UniProtKB/Swiss-Prot annotation:
UniProt-annotated location(s): Plastid, Chloroplast thylakoid membrane
Gene it is expressed from: psbD
A Gene Ontology BP annotation from the UniProt entry: photosynthetic electron transport in photosystem II
N-acetylthreonine: modified positions: 2
Function of the molecule: Photosystem II (PSII) is a light-driven water:plastoquinone oxidoreductase that uses light energy to abstract electrons from H(2)O, generating O(2) and a proton gradient subsequently used for ATP formation. It consists of a core antenna complex that captures photons, and an electron transfer chain that converts photonic excitation into a charge separation. The D1/D2 (PsbA/PsbD) reaction center heterodimer binds P680, the primary electron donor of PSII as well as several subsequent electron acceptors. D2 is needed for assembly of a stable PSII complex.
PTM notes: Only phosphorylated in mesophyll cells, phosphorylation increases when cells are grown under high rather than low light regimes (70 vs 900 umol photons/m-2/s).
Phosphothreonine sites (modified residues): 2
SUBUNIT field: PSII is composed of 1 copy each of membrane proteins PsbA, PsbB, PsbC, PsbD, PsbE, PsbF, PsbH, PsbI, PsbJ, PsbK, PsbL, PsbM, PsbT, PsbX, PsbY, PsbZ, Psb30/Ycf12, at least 3 peripheral proteins of the oxygen-evolving complex and a large number of cofactors. It forms dimeric complexes.
Co-factor: note: The D1/D2 heterodimer binds P680, chlorophylls that are the primary electron donor of PSII, and subsequent electron acceptors. It shares a non-heme iron and each subunit binds pheophytin, quinone, additional chlorophylls, carotenoids and lipids. There is also a Cl(-1) ion associated with D1 and D2, which is required for oxygen evolution. The PSII complex binds additional chlorophylls, carotenoids and specific lipids.
Species name: Zea mays (Maize)
Binding site for chlorophyll a ChlzD2: 118
Membrane topology recorded in Swiss-Prot or TrEMBL: Multi-pass membrane protein
Protein name: Photosystem II D2 protein
Length: 353
């Protein structure tokens, strides 16, 4: 028996290497394998949003006007969620609800599921794009890892939360004012601001803003002067090979200000990555908790005392009453299918009124 040792020669016209070479070759806008997911999904998501906000009404799902055609502007137009009666249907154009009728599909809220799913895959494709580009340019994949934060928030808010509720109806609609309404909804129905995961998310995002401002100002303040220009933008050569700012000077400054300072660039920049990404992940975990209707902090003793003593009130008890007011007003307006009618005497009033 003869055993041949060696490489198997590929056919000249083998399709996979040709496609791989074309996708990953160096060009002005990199395509890559991730681009097969990113570009079509991003195109359809953006195109669907522009189409929906321009032409499509929310009259049949929310009883609202939501398009430019109906008189909305950029801040008030939205692609709204499907009606509550459609539960978690994918609302495919060819599905049993629309039966291939594009107009009916739009009226039922099919564009929302179209946007949510294509938007989610577009974000995932963008993260894969960062992974794919990291290797050829010899980077570590921290950009892609950090982008998992926004993806986690998007998936938790737009997909996981409504999956835990009765339908897509309770997810945010895609629009500026619609997102604001959803934030008020989260507060009124879940007391979102008093949840520890929301607090960690706020600390992460605002902490990252502070770190970003401090870092940018410090680097700008400690740049080496290598020219005689009159201002920052003309005094420095952007192509110089050596380091352009002084870590030692920055460390000395912040040591005097705070008593402590970063002495290692890698730890400093990792911390700037860690704080916002962790904050976004904590927010996403908190929203998953809301999908399961997990409760926030309850200070029942304060509620009982406020109910018994007209002169006792705390910011917490005022917020609880505010939440009840949001629920009473919003449920009747936002869920017309429930036919809720609240008489004036049951609407909450604080002790101070």
């Amino acid at each position: 028996m003869t055993i041949a040792v060696g490489r198997v020669t590929k056919e000249e016209n083998d399709l996979f290497p040709l496609i791989d070479d074309w996708l990953r070759r160096d060009r002005f806008v990199f395509v890559g394998w991730s681009g097969l997911l990113l570009f079509p999904c991003a195109y359809f998501a953006l195109g669907g949003w522009f189409t929906g906000t321009t032409f499509v009404t929310s009259w049949y799902t929310h009883g609202l006007a939501s398009s430019y055609l109906e008189g909305c502007n950029f801040l008030t137009a939205a692609v709204s969620t499907p009606a509550n009666s459609l539960a978690h249907s994918l609302l495919l154009l060819w599905g049993p609800e629309a039966q291939g009728d594009f107009t009916r599909w739009s009226q039922l809220g099919g564009l929302w599921t179209f946007l949510a799913l294509h938007g989610a895959f577009a974000l995932i494709g963008f993260m894969l794009r960062q992974f794919e580009l990291a290797r050829p340019v010899q980077l570590r994949p921290y950009n892609a890892i950090s982008f998992s934060g926004p993806i986690a928030v998007f998936l938790s808010v737009f997909l996981i939360y409504p999956l835990g509720q009765s339908g897509w109806f309770f997810s945010p609609s895609f629009g500026v004012a619609a997102i604001f309404r959803f934030i008020l909804f989260f507060q009124g129905f879940h007391n979102w601001t008093l949840k520890p995961f929301h607090m960690m998310g706020v600390a992460g995002v605002l902490g990252a803003v502070l770190l970003c401002a401090i870092h940018g100002a410090t680097v700008e303040n400690t740049l080496f002067e290598d020219g005689d220009g009159a201002n920052t933008f003309r005094a420095f050569n952007p192509t110089q090979a050596e380091e352009t700012y002084s870590m030692v000077t920055a460390n000395r400054f912040w040591s005097q200000i705070f008593g402590v300072a970063f002495s290692n660039k890698r730890w400093l920049h990792f911390f700037m990555l860690f704080v916002p990404v962790t904050g976004l992940w904590m927010s996403a975990i908190g929203v998953v908790g809301l999908a399961l209707n997990l409760r926030a902090y309850d200070f029942v003793s304060q509620e009982i005392r406020a109910a018994e003593d007209p002169e006792f009130e705390t910011f917490y008890t005022k917020n609880i009453l505010l939440n009840e007011g949001i629920r009473a007003w919003m449920a009747a307006q936002d869920q017309p299918h429930e036919n809720l009618i609240f008489p004036e005497e049951v609407l909450p009033r604080g002790n101070a009124l």
